[in-house]
Amino acid sequence: MKRSSIALTLLIILSLACNLGVNVPAQNQPAETAANSPVTNDAGKPVLLFTIGMHIEPLGETAQGVQSGKGDYHQPAFFEKHVQDILAVTQIVEAHGGRMTIQAQSPFTTVAIESGNTILADLAARGHEMSLHFHEDAHLGKNDESLSVKQWCDVMKQEISLITQASGVTDIRYWSGGNLYVDIYDAAQCAGLDVNSDWKNPQLQETPLEFVGVNPWRPSGGTDGVNLTAFTQHDPNGAVVFLPEGQYDKSNFASMRRSDNAGSDEAYFEFLKESLYASLEAAQAGKTNVFHFTVHPGEFRGDPQHPFDVIEKFLIEVVDPLVASGDVQWAAFSEMADAYIATEK
C-alpha cells in the first residue's frame, strides 16, 4: 500500500512538472541562435515577428528643390556624422542576429550618390532592407493633399529611383509617410510599393488606437486622419499590406520618445518592453503577429562613451531571450508582409 502511494505521488509530481514545462518563462528557457532563420508561422505556437525600423529624415534641399528640416546633408561633416550613427545602430542590431528596414529619401540619397558614399549599398549587402520614408511636404510642397495620384506617384518613383541608385536595390516594396493623403494607396501601388506601416498623424503626432495591434491587414483605402473607416476595413484584394506596430496602449507611442511623456530614454524603452510583452500576449497561433518600433540616426545615443547603450540593453535583456525561446523572430518589414501573404493562401 505504501509502495502504491509513493508511485502515485511520483506520477502526480511528474504530471505537474510536464504541465509547468509548457509555460516556462521565455527568459528562463535555454538560449539558441535564431539568426538569419526563415520566417516561420507554426500553427502550434504564436510567434511575434520583430524588427527595428530607421527613418532617415529629409534634412536639406530635396531632389525636388524643397528646403526641409534642421541641418543639411549637403554639409559633409553633418552627413558623415549621420552615416556613422546609422552604422553604429545597424551593427548593434546585426550582433543580435537582426536586420533593419532602412527608410531613406533625398537629400540623404542624393548626397550619398554625389559623394560616392556606399553606406546604403553596404547595408543592403549585409541583409538590411532598403525602403522609402516619404515626407510628402518635403517632396511635393505644402499643398500636397490637393495634388493628383499621378503627381504623387511620379515623385515617389523619383525617390525610389534615388534609393536604387544609392543602394543597388531594385526591389523596393515598403514605404512610410503620406499618411493624410486619402489616395496614398493608389499612389503607392502606382509607384510599385505594397507594404506600409508607421502611421502617425503628423499634425497631432498621434496614432489612432484603431490602428494598433499585432495582426496585419489590407486596408480598403487611405484616411484623412478623421474618417478611419476605409483604412480599418480589410479588403482581401487590397494592393497594400499594412503592418500595425504592436499592442501599444497610448496614441502618442510613436512620438513620446521625443517628448517629456517618457521621461528618459530608459523610461521609453521600459514602455517598449511592456508593449512588446503585451504584443506577445495578443499574438495568435497560426496568424502573422508583428511588433516593431522606429529610430532615427543619432537618436538614443546617450553616453558618448557607450553610444546607443539603451538599444543594446533592450536587445540583450528583452529581445534575445525571446528569440532564443522561439517566441520572437527577427523579420524585416517585407518579410513580415510575405509571412502574412502566406497565411492568406
Which sequence ranges carry the predicted segments?
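Short coil-to-beta-strand
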Residues: 45-54, 122-133, 239-245
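Well-ordered, non-membrane alpha-helical segments in soluble/globular domains
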Residues: 76-89, 113-117, 149-159, 265-278, ...
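Intrinsically disordered, low-complexity Ser/Thr/Pro-rich tracts
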Residues: 1-45, 188, 342-345
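C-terminal domain-boundary segment and adjacent tail
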Residues: 196-203, 207-211, 263-345
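Active-site-adjacent pocket scaffolds in enzyme catalytic domains
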Residues: 171-289
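Active-site beta->alpha N-cap acidic-glycine motif
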Residues: 39-122, 289-293, 297-300, 306, ...
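Short acidic/His/Gly/Ser-rich catalytic and metal-binding motifs that mark active-site loops
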Residues: 59-64, 139-142, 250-254, 302
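Metal-dependent polysaccharide deacetylase catalytic core of the NodB/CE4 family, i.e.
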Residues: 96-182, 246-249, 290-299, 332-335, ...
